C-alpha cells in the first residue's frame, strides 16, 4: 500500500505535458527522427513460450532506438508487448507465479536496454477475435497484471496500454491507478469494404465507431483526459478487391470515374468509385489536422500513431509535432485548417 500511495502521490505532481506517441516497428531500417515525438513504443515484444517472460523482436533495433535519446534526452522509449495475433497473454496472466515472473523479466529488459517503461498491447483480454487463447477471467487477471507490473517496475517507470476503440475488455476503474497513459486504437473501426476505418465523426461513410466516439467511450469508462491519447493511422484501407483501387495501388493513378473526396461531416478523406460509393479511406494533412484540433479542443493528453515508417514523406508526423507539441500548424497545414 505504501508503494502505491507514494506512486499515486508522485503521479499527481507530474506535469501533464502534451504527448505524441509513435509506434516504431521491428524489421525496418529507417532511423526515426527523435525530435517529432515525445514517446516511442517499440513494437513488439511477445510473451514467451513458457508464459513467464518476454521475447523481443530485433533487439539490436531496439538498442538503436534507445540511442536516439542522445539527440533528444527528453524522449521516452518503451517496449510494447503484444500486437494483433500475439498470444500467450491469457496463460501468462492466469497465475500469480507467471505474472510475477513476467513482470520481473519486464524489469530486467527495462534495465538492460535503458528503457523508460512498458506498453501493454493485449488484443484483447477475454477475446479470441485475433485467434489467440482467452478466458472469462482475463479482464480481472489483466488488472492483477497491471498491479504487479507497477509494483515491480516501481514508481519512476512508465506503464501504458493500448485499447480498442469501444473501451471494452479493460476494468478501467481498477487499472487506472497503475497506468500513465491509455493509447486508444481509434482505427480499424469499420468494415473496410464499406466505410472509412478511422473517421473522426459519425457520417454515412463512417464505421461502427469513430475517433470522437472512441474518446467518449473511454471518458465514460472513467479514463481521465490527462491520461487519454487518441490514435491515428498512417495507413490507408478499403475495398482492395475493387478493380479501380487495384489499379490505383499499382500505378498511383486513379482510373477514370474515380475521385478523391473529402467528407466534412466525418472529417475524413476517401476515394469514391464511378457510382460515388466509398471504396478507399486514407489520411491526409487535412484529416490529421482535424484530429489534432479535436485533441486540443477537448484537452486530451495527446495523439498516438501507427506507425512511423508508413509516413514516407514525414508530413504526417510533422502535423502532430507542430500542432500538439510546438506553436501550432505551419503555413501548409493552416491552408487545410481554413477548410475544416
Predicted feature residues:
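N-terminal signal peptide
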Residues: 2-15, 295
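Glycan-recognition patch characteristic of GH18 chitinases/ENGases
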Residues: 12-110, 197, 204, 329-337
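Short, well-ordered coil/turn segments that N-cap beta-strands
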Residues: 17-18, 36-38, 73-77, 114-116, ...
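Substrate-binding surface in catalytic domains of secreted glycosidases
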Residues: 21, 49-60, 104, 125-257
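Structural recognition of alpha->loop->beta junctions
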Residues: 33-42, 98-122, 173-189
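Conserved, mostly hydrophobic/aromatic
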Residues: 40, 79, 120, 149, ...
Amino acid at each position: 500500500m505504501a508503494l502505491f500511495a507514494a506512486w499515486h502521490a508522485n503521479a499527481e505532481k507530474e506535469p501533464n505535458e502534451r504527448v505524441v506517441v509513435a509506434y516504431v516497428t521491428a524489421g525496418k531500417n529507417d532511423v526515426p527522427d527523435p525530435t517529432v515525438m515525445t514517446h516511442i513504443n517499440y513494437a513488439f515484444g511477445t510473451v514467451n513460450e513458457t508464459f513467464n517472460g518476454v521475447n523481443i523482436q530485433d533487439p539490436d533495433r531496439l538498442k538503436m532506438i534507445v540511442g536516439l535519446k542522445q539527440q533528444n534526452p527528453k524522449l521516452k522509449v518503451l517496449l510494447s508487448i503484444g500486437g494483433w495475433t500475439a498470444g500467450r497473454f491469457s496463460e501468462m496472466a492466469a497465475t500469480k507465479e507467471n505474472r510475477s515472473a513476467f513482470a520481473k523479466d519486464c524489469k530486467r529488459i527495462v534495465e538492460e536496454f535503458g528503457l523508460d517503461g512498458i506498453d501493454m498491447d493485449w488484443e484483447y483480454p477475454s477475446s479470441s477475435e485475433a485467434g489467440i487463447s482467452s478466458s472469462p477471467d482475463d479482464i480481472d487477471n489483466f488488472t492483477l497484471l497491471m498491479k504487479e507490473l507497477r509494483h515491480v517496475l516501481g514508481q519512476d517507470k512508465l506503464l501504458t496500454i493500448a485499447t480498442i476503440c469501444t473501451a471494452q475488455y479493460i476494468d478501467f476503474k481498477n487499472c487506472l491507478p497503475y497506468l500513465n497513459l491509455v493509447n486508444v486504437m481509434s482505427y480499424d473501426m469499420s468494415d473496410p469494404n464499406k466505410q472509412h476505418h478511422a473517421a473522426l465523426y459519425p457520417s454515412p461513410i463512417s464505421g461502427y465507431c469513430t475517433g470522437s466516439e472512441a474518446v467518449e467511450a473511454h471518458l465514460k469508462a472513467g479514463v481521465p483526459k490527462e491520461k487519454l491519447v487518441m490514435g491515428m493511422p498512417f495507413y490507408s484501407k478499403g475495398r482492395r478487391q475493387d478493380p479501380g483501387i487495384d489499379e490505383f495501388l499499382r500505378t498511383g493513378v486513379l482510373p477514370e470515374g474515380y475521385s478523391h473526396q473529402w467528407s466534412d461531416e466525418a472529417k475524413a478523406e476517401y476515394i469514391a468509385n464511378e457510382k460515388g460509393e466509398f471504396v478507399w479511406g486514407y489520411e491526409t494533412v487535412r484529416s490529421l489536422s482535424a484530429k489534432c484540433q479535436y485533441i486540443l479542443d477537448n484537452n486530451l493528453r495527446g495523439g498516438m500513431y501507427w506507425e512511423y515508417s508508413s509516413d514516407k514523406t514525414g508530413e504526417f508526423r510533422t502535423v502532430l509535432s507542430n500542432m500538439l507539441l510546438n506553436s501550432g500548424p505551419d503555413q501548409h497545414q493552416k491552408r487545410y485548417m481554413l477548410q475544416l
